[in-house]
Amino acid sequence: MPRLFLFHLLEFCLLLNQFSRAVAAKWKDDVIKLCGRELVRAQIAICGMSTWSKRSLSQEDAPQTPRPVAEIVPSFINKDTETIIIMLEFIANLPPELKAALSERQPSLPELQQYVPALKDSNLSFEEFKKLIRNRQSEAADSNPSELKYLGLDTHSQKKRRPYVALFEKCCLIGCTKRSLAKYC
């Protein structure tokens, strides 16, 4: 008899545990309709939760798959590559075949570095090069947004803010889930 009682007690505890998990997971799917400061406060509250709940949130949304090692590149290498590409485009005596190749694909950093000595052969000093870049950027600032996009000079911060603005507008006008707010933590 005591075994049967303990078995039923264990079964009851397991059912309560499953119910509490379902209730705890439900908060993520609650729809909230907030604007302005209230929305920012809710975002801070959601992002300020304990780390285990953030980890579980990210595991539910996107299963972890190992990325290939080739995709992991330090950001300073990408910036160096972009800088070298910009410099190579302004070199006057650079062969047109190389300029065409640069526009078609993204070359690797070591591949680009072999052409950097061409800067020494050109008549363009570093100060003149900086002045040329500044002039091009000021011309682009006067241009319309489509030309800015074409030149690649539109600001990075605007690109970063776009998803937030769209989400905040949606939360204010229609409503959004706490799960969607937690994705931007």
UniProtKB/Swiss-Prot annotation:
Subcellular location per the Swiss-Prot or TrEMBL entry: Secreted
Recorded superkingdom: Eukaryota
Record protein name field: Prorelaxin H1
Subunit and interaction comment: Heterodimer of a B chain and an A chain linked by two disulfide bonds.
Signal sequence annotation: 1-22
Prosequence residues removed at maturation: 56-158
Gene Ontology cellular-component terms listed: extracellular region
Phylogenetic classification of the source organism: Eukaryota, Metazoa, Chordata, Craniata, Vertebrata
CDD domains: IlGF_relaxin_like (cd04365)
Annotated keywords: Cleavage on pair of basic residues, Disulfide bond, Hormone, Secreted, Signal
Job description of the protein: Relaxin is an ovarian hormone that acts with estrogen to produce dilatation of the birth canal in many mammals. May be involved in remodeling of connective tissues during pregnancy, promoting growth of pubic ligaments and ripening of the cervix.
GO molecular function annotation: hormone activity
Any Gene Ontology biological process: female pregnancy
Natural source organism: Homo sapiens (Human)
Disulfide bond entries: C35-C172, C47-C185, C171-C176
Coarse class of the protein's main subcellular location: secreted
Family (UniProt): Belongs to the insulin family.
InterPro entries: Insulin-like (IPR016179), Insulin-like_sf (IPR036438), Insulin_CS (IPR022353), Insulin_family (IPR022352), Relaxin (IPR022421), Repro_Hormone_Insulin-like (IPR051042)
Tissue: Prostate. Not expressed in placenta, decidua or ovary.
